[in-house]
Amino acid sequence: MSAKTNPFFVKDALSVEDILDELMGHDHGEEKDEHVWLSLKNAETLVTAIADALQELDPDNKDTYAANASAYIEKLSALDGAYQSAVDGAARKTVLFGDRFPFRYLVDDYGLSYYAAFAGCSAESEASFETVSFLAKKVDELGLPCVLTIEGKNHKLAETIVRSTAGKNQKVLTMDSMQSMTSKDAANGATYLSVMERNLSVLKEALD
């Protein structure tokens, strides 16, 4: 069964070495997931590492790099706190994706459980009858108000799961993994922080 609950919880952010291992696909006996940027805690680690590298390359401007990194990390930390507060006050602690699941690091950060049709790096797009049935029953069992998807135009699987539930009235909501971000999106004002803020709004609704 490809649908599953959260296999483990990560209490602390990954180190730079851990993040590089994930990005390079090194196998530690766990399912690999390169979507490390979807953890705000990991993002703080990455910003620090980038700032340190820039200061070594350009020591004349090290104070500027340090100040910029500090200001950005403060914003990341504030948003991280907003996520934690939202989860702490939520009625539910489980999300269900009728799609691939690239948000493992995010749910691990806040102690959430999850069910998903496919792993985050899966190339699959067609779920079996058993998977659809399993996920629909979980929606009913847990009283979930939403079935989540990732960005993209094809949400047919999530819609099929909803049609297979008893109530057939759950919303299909989208969280953005930023895998499809374009230069046009950036020109229109999309940033890492703005996307993660939108994801927080969706998560709040899914956990309500």
Identify the meaning behind each predicted range.
Residues 1-208:
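Extracytoplasmic metal-acquisition and chelation regions
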